[in-house]
A protein has these predicted regions:
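Active-site acidic/histidine proton-transfer and metal-coordination neighborhood
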Residues: 2-120, 191
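Histidine-acidic metal/acid-base catalytic patches
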Residues: 5-7, 13, 17, 46, ...
Length: 209
């Protein structure tokens, strides 16, 4: 009886693996076609990098598996980007930066991805929401953070919760190449917020033009 049960289990396992292989065989060409078209478009615009922001929500117990899955996915996209002379960046959300038992989804991605292939874009407000110190993050992943999103609760520099001057200075020291002012939340008319954010950033001593 045990032998029959085991044979059944083995057969089931083979069926599952076969289904997974079929799924992968279907998925990757579709994925590659989409990214090929997207990257060709981005390349035609003169961009030197392309960024993917956050991943679909997942349960805490799936963190390790999701990190393994997305690390492999990011490396495939990074390879396609590299063929076009571009770099691929991953922009983690606050949920992906927040640590559980001392490690975050972002930490796992960083561990699993080749540091020569996958780069990072760090958002100051997402880090704030996650309770993560941006300076420490830049230092921990020195040389791997390609760009920064200067992002505040509303107008950049107005909340006083983030030392943007210090973040920019340390970012440059840690290899950041691109700095972007992000305006997502508005306490004034949108264009007023954008103008004020830009003006605030341009007054910082650390900014290089």
């Amino acid at each position: 009886e045990r032998g029959e049960e085991n044979n059944g289990d083995v057969a089931d396992d083979k069926e599952v693996k076969a289904e997974e292989n079929i799924s992968d065989a279907v998925q990757y060409p579709v994925e590659q076609k989409w990214w090929t078209e997207a990257l060709d478009t981005v390349k035609s615009l003169g961009c030197k990098s392309v960024t993917m922001a956050k991943v679909p929500a997942f349960a805490p117990h799936d963190t390790e598996q999701m990190a393994t899955t997305y690390a492999a996915y990011f490396e495939r996209v990074a390879a396609l980007a590299a063929e076009r002379g571009m770099k691929f960046c991953y922009h983690p959300s606050s949920a992906e930066l927040k640590a559980t038992d001392g490690v975050s989804f972002f930490d796992l991605i960083a561990q699993k991805c080749d540091k020569e292939k996958v780069w990072f874009q760090i958002d100051t407000f997402e880090a704030l929401q996650a309770g993560v110190d941006v300076i420490s993050l830049l230092e921990q992943y020195k040389g791997r953070v390609l760009s920064l999103h200067l992002h505040d609760r509303s107008v950049v520099c107005d909340s006083g919760e983030i030392d943007f001057d210090k973040v920019i200075k340390r970012g440059y020291e840690c290899g950041v190449k691109l700095i972007i002012v992000e305006q997502r939340h508005f306490t004034l008319p949108p264009m007023n917020c954008v103008e004020r954010s830009l003006q605030n950033v341009l007054t910082l001593a650390s900014v290089r033009l």
